[in-house]
Each structure stands twice: as C-alpha cells, then as structure tokens.
Curated annotation (Swiss-Prot):
Keywords: Acyltransferase, Cytoplasm, Membrane, Phosphoprotein, Transferase. Its EC number is 2.3.1.97. Adds a myristoyl group to the N-terminal glycine residue of certain cellular and viral proteins. Also able to mediate N-terminal lysine myristoylation of proteins: catalyzes myristoylation of ARF6 on both 'Gly-2' and 'Lys-3'. Lysine myristoylation is required to maintain ARF6 on membranes during the GTPase cycle. Residues 1-82 are annotated as: Disordered. It comes from the Eukaryota. The gene is NMT1. This is Glycylpeptide N-tetradecanoyltransferase 1. InterPro entries: Acyl_CoA_acyltransferase, NMT, NMT_C, NMT_CS, NMT_N. Tetradecanoyl-CoA binds at residues 118-120, 247-250, 256, 258-260. It is an enzyme of class 2 (transferase). PROSITE patterns: NMT_1, NMT_2.
Length: 496
C-alpha cells in the first residue's frame, strides 16, 4: 500500500484470466476452471480493492440454485438477498468465504501450491512446481482437429457474434457490464464501452468465429462469451503466431453449469482450425504456470472522489486538504513538442515501438496496420501523444487507454474513470518526464486514477510520481509453450 505520507490506494482489481480451449485463460485470458463461479476474464486492472481480477463468488446465488425446483436459466427469479442492504450482503458473503477457505481461486503461489488443478492438468501448460529451462511447444501441432463444436448444457446454443450489428454489440456490452470482473469487495465492476469492445475485439486479422457466444435457445438471451484475437508474439528468441484470449464471461446464474471450460475448449478448437496452437493470456489468479508476474500501481488524480468511493483511504495523520495538495499536478504538460498522434506519425511510431521492445523477453510484434489500430487516438478509448523536436522529428511517445468502472451502491458517484498505461517509448525525453506529462494529460481529460503495471521500465517512475502499490498481482501465461519465467521488468506486453 502507499507510504504513510500518502493516501493509501486500493488497486483496481486486475484482469481476470483469459483462456483457451484447453488453454489457459488466455488472452487467452485464463480462467480458474476449478472454481467456475469466479470465472470472468479481462486483462486490465479493475478499480480498487484488489488487483486480483477474479470475480468474487456469489454464494448467495449458488445457494438459491441448490434449492430444489429453481431452474438454472438466465430467467431465474432474483435472489431474495438483493433486498438486504449492500453492507449486510457483503458481510454475509465474507462470512461464507471464511467457511470455504481453500475453495476460491489462488491469489498467490503459496495458495496455489495447496490447490488441485484438474482442468489445467489436462492442458498443455507446465505444472506449477515445474522448473522450466527449455524453450518450445508443450505438445506438437495437431493434424486431426475436431470438426464439431463442443456440447453445451441443454437449452444453450453457440452463436458467433456479429459485432458489426449494434444490437448484438449492445447485448455483449450488457452481458459484460452485469457479469464481468468485479473487485473482491463488490464495489467496482469494469464498464467496457461498446466502442472499446470494437477496438479490443476487431484488430487487423480478426475473425468472426472467434467472437464466440452462448445463447439460451428459447429466449435467445446472451449468457456466455469468449474471444480470441490474432497476435504475433516474440518470446525470448522465438516469434510465434498466437492468439490473445479475452472477455471470458458466463452469466452469474449459469456459473454452476461449468460452462467456462466448454467455452475454453470451443475457442481453442476454433483457433486450432485456423492453424494456431499457442496463446498468451493474463489472470489475476494463479494457475499453472505463470511465465511472469506483474503488479498494478495506482496514481490518484481525483483523490477526493477516490476516497469518497473507498477506492482509496486517508492515511494516518493526513487530512483531505493535505492529500489533495500531495497529488496536485501542473495545469499543463512541460515537454516541448508534445502533441496528439496524427496519421502522419504512424510509420515513425511503428519504428520507435519495434526498436524499443527488443530489450524485453515477451513482446508483441506489430505491423504498421496494427500500430495504427492500437495507437491512433480515439476519444474515450485510446490516447497517444508524440514528442516532436525542433527539427520536426518524432522522438518519443506515450499512450494510455480508457477503462471506466461502475461504482456499485454509492449514492452520488456512479462511474470511476481510469486511464491504463499502454506503451511508452523514450529516446530523447526522460521517461520520468514523459509519464509526468501523461498524468497531467489524463487529469486534464477528467480521469480519476491512472493505473500502470510494474513491467518494462515502469518501476523507474512509479514511486517518484506518487503511485501507490496495488494489493494483487497480474500473472502472464502462455498456452502450449514452455520457457523460463521472467521478471516483470522483462515483460513488454500490455493486454487490454
């Protein structure tokens, strides 16, 4: 947590795992299939509370399902406990968790060592305790790939979502908004906008069959989803065509049906059909076996609001006024020549990024078309600023994406606007100055908090710029690829 002289900041809960067919959670964000009620995927950090990204189990819903004649469909009646005060519900949930220690997802390697991973033990991933010194696939590419989709629970059917249809896109937005990643205290939930989802799910090379939905046959209600997007990944000395799996989400009322493992197997099957056999993904929980572990850090931009919604709290001997003074930022950036990225900058941004990432062990290999997609500014989605020197040369750039969280059960504040550090490349401007300006720009744009992982060179500026450490980790995983693990400073990949 933050130093005593600062406001203690609760990190946004990190992304949930992502997964693949028998893959990992993968960005395949991996999911903890041994504890399906917690499955929800995502890559980024959520609002405070914990950086685990794993959704808190809704035991009250599960108990209701066990009571006899209730069906497990998405049309079930609302749980009676919803009529209780939010604080009381949270107390009951905490109490239930105390009686089920060992049942939830592991947040640390120590906890993970005491778990059994029946699902992951069947997948081509290293075992948790395995020491890996080699590089290469866990199993060879498959020749005989299953042609038929995997079987879903009765009453459900597969549907490849056409996100070009605004109605379908809104359905996906609603599913994620109501069932995706929350922090462990059920105070914040990621709120991916429809436009953000198009950005995240339709990069160059996207395939419609990799937007894999599950619907109720009778009502056509969307109750499950998992996605894959193509990515060329450089891992140590090897470049591999992979996928990133993201947005694994199952409707809360279907969590007992073990739909998540079927979603993972099905997306993996579809990926295999396209000749891709490796994936990368992140998870806020520990699964077999992380290739790297990073931590979220959070920098207050609007400390009063963050404290009011309990994202942060006042440290000992700190008043609100002193806290606001502590986090005060300049009115404008100080780097000369800093301006929003334009179309003409795409080639040089591509060149700068490619050269910069060579120092890390796990990185994306982007084409110029991909750089345009991921970095060209879009309001409320992605911001990129370049530094142009007196000679008209672009020498540096910074970028951050927008991911708000819904604030649940608060009388005044309904949304927390969070900026997430993306890729920041420096050749002439010191990284500390570049990131100080990133904070100023985010504050000018109305963000409440600026989040960053401690990967790449980020550790060099986090404490100096008054970031507070989060209370959870984000694990990086590879599906069907073995290699030695690496420190956070060698991870050069940021997943949305």
């Amino acid at each position: 947590m933050a130093d005593e002289s600062e406001t203690a900041v609760k990190p946004p809960a990190p992304p949930l795992p992502q997964m693949m067919e028998g893959n990992g959670n993968g960005h395949e964000h991996c999911s903890d299939c041994e504890n399906e009620e917690d499955n929800s995927y995502n890559r980024g950090g959520l609002s405070p509370a914990n950086d685990t990204g794993a959704k808190k189990k809704k035991k009250k819903q599960k108990k209701k399902k066990e009571k006899g004649s209730e069906t497990d469909s998405a049309q079930d009646q609302p749980v009676k406990m919803n009529s209780l005060p939010a604080e009381r519900i949270q107390e009951i949930q905490k109490a239930i968790e105390l009686f089920s220690v060992g049942q939830g997802p592991a947040k640390t390697m120590e906890e993970a060592s005491k778990r059994s991973y029946q699902f992951w033990d069947t997948q081509p991933v290293p075992k948790l305790g395995e020491v890996v010194n080699t590089h290469g696939p866990v199993e060879p590419d498959k020749d005989n790939i299953r042609q038929e989709p995997y079987t879903l629970p009765q009453g459900s059917t597969w549907d490849a979502l056409d996100l070009g249809d605004r109605g379908v896109l809104k359905e996906l937005y609603t599913l994620l908004n109501e069932n995706y990643v929350e922090d462990d205290d059920n105070m914040f939930r990621f709120d991916y906008s429809p436009e953000f989802l198009l950005w995240a799910l339709r990069p160059p090379g996207w395939l419609p069959q990799w937007h894999c939905g599950v619907r109720v046959v009778s009502s056509r209600k969307l109750v499950g989803f998992i996605s894959a997007i193509p990515a060329n990944i450089h891992i140590y000395d090897t470049e591999k065509k992979m996928v990133e799996i993201n947005f694994l989400c199952v409707h809360k009322k279907l969590r007992s049906k073990r739909v998540a493992p079927v979603l993972i197997r099905e997306i993996t099957r579809r990926i295999h059909l396209e000749g891709v056999f490796q994936a990368v993904y992140t998870a806020g929980v520990v699964l077999p076996k992380p290739v790297g572990t990073c931590r979220y850090w959070h920098r207050s931009l609007n400390p009063r609001k963050l404290i009011e919604v309990k994202f942060s709290h006042l440290s000992r001997n700190m008043t609100m006024q002193r806290t606001m003074k502590l986090y005060r930022l300049p009115e404008t950036p100080k780097t000369a020549g800093l301006r929003p990225m334009e179309t003409k900058d795409i080639p040089v941004v591509h060149q700068l990024l490619t050269r910069y990432l060579k120092q890390f062990h796990l990185t994306p290999v982007m084409s110029q078309e991909e750089v345009e997609h991921w970095f060209y500014p879009q309001e409320n989605i992605i911001d990129t600023f370049v530094v142009e020197n007196a000679n008209g040369e672009v020498t540096d750039f910074l970028s951050f994406y927008t991911l708000p969280s819904t604030i649940m059960n608060h009388p005044t504040h309904k949304s927390l606007k969070a900026a997430y550090s993306f890729y920041n490349v420096h050749t002439q401007t010191p990284l500390l100055d570049l990131m100080s300006d990133a904070l100023v720009l985010a504050k000018m744009k109305g963000f409440d908090v600026f989040n960053a992982l401690d990967l790449m060179e980020n550790k060099t500026f986090l404490e100096k710029l008054k970031f507070g450490i989060g209370d959870g980790n984000l694990q990086y995983y590879l599906y069907n690829w073995k290699c030695p693990s690496m420190g956070a400073e060698k991870v050069g990949l940021v997943l949305q």
